């Protein structure tokens, strides 16, 4: 598997890198949480902007982003606006979403930016190129909170993300059975073995899929989301447990 190197952090090499989400509603609370997170054992902080009360105010986002970058120092910062269609808090029209992405890129504060595969559609390659020009790596994401598609579909979706230029294809799906969890894990291993051009991030959500958040080094998922006190998705495991298990399973 190839490696994405950001601020000396090699994503795709060794132990999966740990992401912890900020989901607070106000700038004050966000910055307080960031100061707390800067002392924790985590590689990356995700700002879930759709949880921010100013989510539809671009000036408020820009103002908070600049302060957040300073507080986190050299900790990786991932910007995410999870749309309502993909499990987030706020609905955005297509043009609003594109404008948001471009506004965040212009701040020069993002190490990584989440771009939703289906939300952007045909404009994905051009938007990824814009992100790279701005110096941000792209997490290209797809979420299904209802089911787990067949393995072939999961693999083809991640390959399409790679072909569009994404640095880190990401899939999150909901299992309805143990077999669904195995489908996601098998798709992850297949991608890592047969399409190692980029690292990938995968997870099977909910309690049933929690094993997928902990087995990344062996099966091919380069990053995992942990719960530092407040989860941003179903099935996130506590940061303490994630670190303990990743250490125990380190190859």
State each model region's role.
Residues 2-3, 13-133, 143-148:
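Active-site beta->alpha loop and helix N-cap motifs at the rims of alpha/beta catalytic domains
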Residues 6-7:
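Glycine-/acidic-rich phosphate or pyrophosphate-binding loops and their flanking alpha/beta elements
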